[in-house]
Amino acid sequence: MKTIFMAITKKAVPKKTAVKKEKPVMKYSDKSAGQPELVLIFERIKQLMLPYEKGVMKLHGGKDGQVHLISHKPIEFEGRKKPEIWFVSAVVQKGYVGFYFMPIYGYKALGEKLHPDLMKCLKGKACFHIKKNDETLFKQMKEAIKMGYDMYKERGWT
């Protein structure tokens, strides 16, 4: 019995060229009706963070709707060594600016010292949803940042 083998050739598939997508300026720039207000809130929070950028505290980002203030001093927290510790962040989200205040995450009693109006904005362990360009709220955030910085300084994290 004779077997016939036929060579099967594959057609050449054209190579795909990568198409670069334009990166949006802000994560939700075209999805939120209140976006112009959110940009103002973001810029105000960023201004509150600037005085604390000194020594090992470095500001990262500031564009694209994200800014982070991080202490680059190696620390030990709850028995774990960390190369850095995050302090405060602001991120433009859909419908609000996330004000991430990490001192409250590691020191729950700090929440009792913060103003009740600011605490109403707390929606997670350390994330405050800031939706209004409210001067009173900015004063409360400024006080919170100072308290948090003093706490970090007390612990030797700055």
Task: Walk through the language-model features, giving the residues of each.
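Charge-dense, helix-prone N-terminal extensions
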Residues: 2-158
